[in-house]
């Protein structure tokens, strides 16, 4: 059996090293894609300036100095909405301000991916969905806020929360590259050259930073000891122990670590095991409606 893993952003040497231990040989084959030069420009954000205002100034500068559509990377839908509010009153009439994020309706996402009509320009305010998952045609200018929203385990609650952090150099390079897909482009970075050199090359792997309850429950359903599985990044021992203790407390795993009937029922729900247990245990009583409302509020947050 031959397995070919392809990615534009993977840490190839890490994959090769880990897979070589089990396969004996896992060579890296590099295929250089066609890219064009991208002019990197640094415009540091003032410490006390609101993000949407600094993004607005950068967009106006790019509209004056460069041609083509603009792709702006922001950490979340809240920042996108605020930046849109700033830009709508300050951009010329021939400029379309559109939003792109996974939380938006598909029709709006599809509209954001379509090039503007002849004679018009487009500013796409996007999350990191446009970094690797989607290609926005017609973009020759990228503006990178330099921050990202990533999941992290909250030790106080035992649940995963989203935190805003400084993005990595790898992410910045990937975002800048979006400006040079079809011709020479320009990338504005909202930080300075010195700060650029101090950024992490890569952010820590997500699986090492989040709650592992869902992962542990899924693996228990497979019936395979977790120690027999090969991971690119070693799972934190403390997080894994906490996950198994939590699943046992919820009676989703038995004393031997095997998945229970309740555990399989919870696994079928698209919820964290803690929340799924609330639903499964109260499905047939009078409070299930209240629980559904509580979960809807929690998940909306």
Question: PLM ranges: what are they?
Answer:
Residues 1-278:
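P-loop NTPase motor module signature
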Residues 272-301:
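Leucine-rich, amphipathic alpha-helical/linker segments
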